[in-house]
Amino acid sequence: MTTPTPLAPDGDDPLVIAGTPLRSRLLIGTAGYPTQAIMAEAVRASGAEIATVSIRRVSLRGHGSDTVSLLAGHRFLPNTAGCETARDAVMTAELAREALGTAWIKVEVIGDRETLYPDVAETLEATRQLVDAGFVVLPYCNDDPVVCARLADLGAAAVMPMGSLIGSGMGVANPANLELICRRSPVPVIVDAGIGTASDAVIAMELGAAAVLLNTAVAKADDPVRMARAMRHAVEAGRLAHGAGRIPRRARAEPSSPQLGLVGS
């Protein structure tokens, strides 16, 4: 007997990545919080099922780290942060699979240290090699529809275009590109990087993103736990608004109340 796919809390279809249904469309990072205890509380407040973790902060002997033990029950998405070549990213992914027992990997291959822009050629090559090695690959990339299409063609389980520069808090810098990517992509689009506050997450979801991944916006907020809760509601609101359909923009007013029967008419 087939187990029914669980619906999200609002009755929406769940996010599905590589055949795995997820109730939350928010993915959250675990770096940069004031304390590990605040990190764990914020992750729980966000409602996220997936937490990203840098393999550099996880024991390779299999004993785990504070992050892993504090977030028991969550699905971990290790990343290749700090890698600058496909070779390094593949090696880091192999270490992550050994340390965490997961084939899921967020590929980050940085091409410029000042802007933290991804290296497109190396990201494509890392994705190709890791897909061939049996990984579930979620690559971080620039907001280029062609690059996202190439990554999907290579077998990426989702694509993760940047909203804006990592840690910048500038929100969605290129909504036209992002909307095009979301409309065309055959795999889920997860907006990654640049989210600064809840309204940024709403915009990303309204443009058609399947999910949002964020870290700094919560970790560096004055109250990370409260911001995590805000992000949870923002992602849900943006998803609902996208499905509901916004009214067209007009350059003129249009009354919402009927004009018939007005006094003096």
UniProtKB/Swiss-Prot annotation:
Q: Where in the cell is it found?
A: Cytoplasm
The catalytic site is made up of 106 (schiff-base intermediate with dxp)
E.C. number = 2.8.1.10
Q: Which CDD domains does its entry note?
A: ThiG
Q: Which domain of life is it from?
A: Bacteria
**Which residues are listed for 1-deoxy-D-xylulose 5-phosphate binding in this entry?**
167, 193-194, 215-216
| Reaction(s) catalysed (UniProt annotation) | [ThiS sulfur-carrier protein]-C-terminal-Gly-aminoethanethioate + 2-iminoacetate + 1-deoxy-D-xylulose 5-phosphate = [ThiS sulfur-carrier protein]-C-terminal Gly-Gly + 2-[(2R,5Z)-2-carboxy-4-methylthiazol-5(2H)-ylidene]ethyl phosphate + 2 H2O + H(+)
* Molecular function via GO: thiazole synthase activity
Q: Which PANTHER family match?
A: THIAZOLE SYNTHASE (PTHR34266:SF2)
The protein's role, per its UniProt record:
Catalyzes the rearrangement of 1-deoxy-D-xylulose 5-phosphate (DXP) to produce the thiazole phosphate moiety of thiamine. Sulfur is provided by the thiocarboxylate moiety of the carrier protein ThiS. In vitro, sulfur can be provided by H(2)S.
Q: What is this protein called?
A: Thiazole synthase
